[in-house]
Amino acid sequence: MFYHNKSIFHPVTFFLIGIPGLEDFHMWISGPFCSVYLVALLGNATILLVIKVEQTLREPMFYFLAILSTIDLALSTTSVPRMLGIFWFDAHEINYGACVAQMFLIHAFTGMEAEVLLAMAFDRYVAVCAPLHYATILTSQVLVGISMCIVIRPVLLTLPMVYLIYRLPFCQAHIIAHSYCEHMGIAKLSCGNIRINGIYGLFVVSFFVLNLVLIGISYVYILRAVFRLPSHDAQLKALSTCGAHVGVICVFYIPSVFSFLTHRFGHQIPGYIHILVANLYLIIPPSLNPIIYGVRTKQIRERVLYVFTKK
């Protein structure tokens, strides 16, 4: 069914296939996805609870970690429950407006995650390269400003995607070979010119690349400062403060780069591999981030044990 809007036809609903080629295995696939989603919910909720309860965890690093956990909860919840609805209840149809809203939220929260990782890199840079000025540089006003940038820039970058989708005519095609709605997945169903959609998508990706470059530059300075320290123990201690952040960066960027490369150049790779990678990209980082910080950050590890064992 279609409705007419200023000479542009939009479908009332889209049909999300799920994982094309693996429809018969949806029920089996749902188990691991549900388990990982529950780990993401429990892990990030625990991080937020510990940071809220423990007054000693008030450093900027934990402030950014709380933001990261909030974004991870939002990102995974935006995509996984809808996906499980497809796997468990054959709830394939999604309203046109709901599909565009899901697209906006997924892209916006993904952008926010990239922004908060950049902010955390700046925090580690100041902590290692200018430790005596840490408190004077990362003041509460600066933290508020960084927090606003974390939210505002991805939202501003994602909003044009909504317009670029609404301007497109959709003649008869309404089947999306995916388990969630994303920008180019919707655009490719259009019978209009989607060149501007592709160009803008690459423009947005360039900001992810820029963030990664800036993170890399910050770690060049961090490593230079670390290797100038007089003792081996001091070097290890300084590097250990960055270990969790490096792990989270790898968890976020490696799947995203792999997903991008397989989508752009892996034309011989089966379609279900593309979709599985895209799904893992949205659920693996939110589930692993709290585990990485719980294992690698002494304060978090000790406080988690304290909060859940104290009487």
Curated annotation (Swiss-Prot):
Alphabetized UniProt keyword annotations: Cell membrane, Disulfide bond, G-protein coupled receptor, Glycoprotein, Membrane, Olfaction, Receptor, Sensory transduction, Transducer, Transmembrane, Transmembrane helix
Glycosylation: residue positions: 5
Membrane topology, Cytoplasmic segments: 49-56, 123-141, 219-238, 296-311
Disulfide bonds: 99-191
Residue ranges of the TM segments: 28-48, 57-77, 102-122, 142-162, 199-218, 239-259, 275-295
Single GO term (MF): G protein-coupled receptor activity
One Pfam family per UniProt: 7tm_4
Extracellular compartment spans: 1-27, 78-101, 163-198, 260-274
Location(s) in or outside the cell: Cell membrane
Annotated Gene Ontology cellular component terms: plasma membrane
Classification via InterPro entries: GPCR_Rhodpsn, GPCR_Rhodpsn_7TM, Olfact_rcpt, OR51/52/56-like
Membrane topology type: Multi-pass membrane protein
Purpose of the protein: Odorant receptor.
Family statement drawn from the similarity comment of this UniProt entry: Belongs to the G-protein coupled receptor 1 family.
Record's protein name: Olfactory receptor 52J3
Species for this entry: Homo sapiens (Human)
